[in-house]
């Protein structure tokens, strides 16, 4: 069997990237979520967690031994050098985890979904990039509704993510998600049919 090629799927908060990912899964495409990989590498018993505790102390653990993400975020928020240390520890481990899960794919192509595909350098692991793009007013509206957060909070998250034009610059394909769910699903099906004709992510 030929090795599946890898599609990078990304989009800003509230763009509909998760809904698109779910529909690709329903069509039988193997998908790896970078956010999940980031959680797996710091599970109890994994070497990364021991190193984090060694550096920051037991205060960043929950009573059940899991990583207290909020406490860790607080520790690194005002300390760029600590954040860099953490990134240097975790990024290679997350990358290795992603590669391992992508290797299990049995579909003609596999998807790596990541909100930080462009910023983290994870797009180097892909053959093609699909950006789910949404007008900013819809991103704000959807995220405020879904996460019950203020417009200010959503705007601060948007600022931390790659700028829309930066993401689009790296896109091979763009799915404009400015309609309802059935519109999004039709677009995913259209792209899926096209992707099945590709070899190595190229026509």
UniProtKB/Swiss-Prot annotation:
Cell location: Cytoplasm
Record SUPFAM superfamilies: P-loop containing nucleoside triphosphate hydrolases
Disulfide bonds: none
Record keywords: ATP-binding, Coenzyme A biosynthesis, Cytoplasm, Kinase, Nucleotide-binding, Transferase
Catalysed reactions, as listed in the record: 3'-dephospho-CoA + ATP = ADP + CoA + H(+)
Example of a GO cellular component annotation carried by this entry: cytoplasm
Keyword Plastid: no
Transport listed as a keyword: no
GO biological process: coenzyme A biosynthetic process
Uppermost EC category: transferase
Domain of life: Bacteria
Residues noted as binding ATP in the record, renumbered to the chain: 14-19
Involved pathway(s): Cofactor biosynthesis; coenzyme A biosynthesis; CoA from (R)-pantothenate: step 5/5
The EC number(s) this enzyme carries: 2.7.1.24
DPCK domain residues: 6-203
Gene3D superfamilies recorded: P-loop containing nucleotide triphosphate hydrolases (3.40.50.300)
Molecular-function annotations in GO: ATP binding; dephospho-CoA kinase activity
Transmembrane region(s): none
InterPro entries: Depp_CoAkinase, P-loop_NTPase
Primary location recorded for the protein, binned into one broad class: cytoplasm
Entry's family note: Belongs to the CoaE family.
Purpose of the protein: Catalyzes the phosphorylation of the 3'-hydroxyl group of dephosphocoenzyme A to form coenzyme A.
NCBIfam families noted in UniProt: dephospho-CoA kinase (TIGR00152)
Protein name: Dephospho-CoA kinase
Naturally occurring in which organism (per UniProt): Pseudomonas aeruginosa (strain ATCC 15692 / DSM 22644 / CIP 104116 / JCM 14847 / LMG 12228 / 1C / PRS 101 / PAO1)
């Amino acid at each position: 069997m030929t090795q599946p090629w890898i599609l990078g799927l990304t989009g800003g908060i509230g763009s509909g990237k998760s809904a698109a990912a779910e529909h690709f899964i329903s069509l039988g495409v193997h998908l790896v979520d970078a956010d999940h990989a980031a959680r797996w590498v710091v599970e109890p018993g994994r070497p990364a967690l021991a190193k984090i505790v060694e550096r920051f102390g037991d205060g960043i653990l929950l009573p059940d031994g899991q990583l207290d993400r909020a406490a860790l975020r607080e520790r690194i928020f005002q300390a760029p050098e600590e954040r860099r240390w953490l990134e240097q520890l975790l990024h290679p481990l997350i990358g290795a985890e992603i590669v391992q899960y992508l290797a299990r794919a049995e579909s003609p192509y596999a998807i790596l979904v990541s909100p930080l595909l462009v910023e983290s350098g994870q797009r180097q692991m892909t053959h093609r990039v699909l950006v789910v793009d949404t007008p900013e007013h819809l991103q704000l509206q959807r995220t405020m509704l879904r996460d019950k957060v203020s417009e200010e909070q959503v705007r601060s998250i948007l600022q931390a993510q790659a700028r829309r034009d930066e993401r689009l610059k790296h896109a091979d394909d763009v799915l404009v998600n400015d309609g309802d769910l059935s519109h999004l699903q039709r677009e995913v099906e259209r792209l899926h049919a096209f992707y099945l004709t590709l070899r190595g992510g190229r026509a």
